């Protein structure tokens, strides 16, 4: 298990885990999101190749349309 800090909340996930797998497990696949890992924005093209480790800090922002 790995522990991640996601939007200020500690959560545990099975290891190994990539950013793309995390997005799937959080049911965010297909949504317009931006993710920051340890202070760095991760481009969508790198989600599948970005491994996560215990202690990583993630900020996930979901874009909401409106007008």
How would you label these PLM feature ranges?
Residues 1-66:
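Ubiquitin-like/PB1-type beta-grasp interaction modules and other compact soluble beta-rich domains
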């Amino acid at each position: 298990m790995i522990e991640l800090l996601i939007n200020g909340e500690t959560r545990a996930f099975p290891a190994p885990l990539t950013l793309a797998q995390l997005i799937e497990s959080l049911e965010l696949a297909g949504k317009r999101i931006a993710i920051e890992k340890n202070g760095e924005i991760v481009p969508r093209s790198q989600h599948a190749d970005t491994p996560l480790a215990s202690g990583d800090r993630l900020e996930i922002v979901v874009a909401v349309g409106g007008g």
